[in-house]
């Protein structure tokens, strides 16, 4: 059991023939008692401060643990977001590729259709040209016909005179 200031104060020594001066010993013990009380008081204060600091350390340890957990949760959430973003990006790329293929196929189909229409128009223009040429040639033949000369010889006045 540790020594207390009262133990120091109440300590008695046996007297011997050539012993110490009693007043001097009592003064020294009184001084030791005062110093010991100061040391004990400081010890108590320091223990209280240590307890307070231990509580604060515990509090900060809890905060640290909470922050570490929060960081882990945030990292996991970030990884989830990253994974989901990558999946979504792949889906978008896949969808874009499908759309591109569809657009290309539609364009090829339209270009084939237009090419077929062009060929059909070429055929129709050849037919039209041939028919038009035949019409013009027929008209030229009519113009070259001698019947026109006969019409020019026909006199209109003579027709009116006959009717009168």
Swiss-Prot record:
Disruption phenotype: Misplacement of the septum during cell division, resulting in the formation of small, circular, anucleate minicells.
Subcellular location: Cytoplasm
Effect recorded for residue 121 to P: In divIVA2; loss of function
Alphabetical GO biological process terms: division septum assembly; peptidoglycan-based cell wall biogenesis; sporulation resulting in formation of a cellular spore
Pfam families to which the protein is assigned, alphabetical: DivIVA (PF05103)
GO MF annotations in UniProt: identical protein binding
Gene Ontology CC terms, in alphabetical order: cytoplasm
Resulting phenotype, residue 17 to L: Diffuse localization
Keyword entries, A-Z: Cell cycle, Cell division, Coiled coil, Cytoplasm, Septation, Sporulation
Subcellular location, principal: cytoplasm
Upregulation: Constitutively expressed.
Domain of life of the organism encoding this protein: Bacteria
Gene3D superfamilies cross-referenced by the UniProt entry: 6.10.250.660
Coiled-coil segments: 29-107
Keyword Ribosomal protein belongs to the record: no
Family the UniProt entry places it in: Belongs to the DivIVA family.
Assembly, per entry: Oligomers. Interacts with FtsZ, MinD, MinJ and Spo0J. The association with Spo0J is transient and occurs at a specific point during development.
Extra remark: Overexpression of DivIVA is lethal.
Functional note: May act as a pilot protein, directing MinCD to the polar septation sites or by inhibiting MinCD at the midcell site of division. Required for polar localization of the chromosome during sporulation.
Protein name: Septum site-determining protein DivIVA
Lineage: Bacteria, Bacillati, Bacillota, Bacilli, Bacillales
């Amino acid at each position: 059991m540790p020594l207390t200031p009262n133990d120091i104060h109440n300590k008695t020594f046996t007297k011997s023939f050539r012993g110490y001066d009693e007043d001097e010993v009592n003064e020294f013990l009184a001084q030791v008692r005062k110093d010991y009380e100061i040391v004990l008081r400081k010890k108590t204060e320091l223990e209280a401060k240590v307890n307070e600091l231990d509580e604060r350390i515990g509090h900060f340890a809890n905060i640290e643990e909470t922050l570490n957990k929060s960081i882990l949760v945030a990292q996991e959430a970030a990884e989830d977001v990253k994974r989901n973003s990558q999946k979504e990006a792949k889906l978008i790329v896949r969808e874009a590729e499908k759309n591109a293929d569809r657009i290309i196929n539609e364009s090829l189909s339209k270009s084939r259709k237009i090419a077929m229409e062009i060929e059909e128009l070429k055929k129709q223009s050849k037919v039209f040209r041939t028919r038009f040429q035949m019409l013009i040639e027929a008209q030229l033949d009519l113009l070259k016909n001698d019947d026109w000369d006969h019409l020019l010889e026909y006199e209109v006045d003579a027709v009116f005179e006959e009717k009168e």
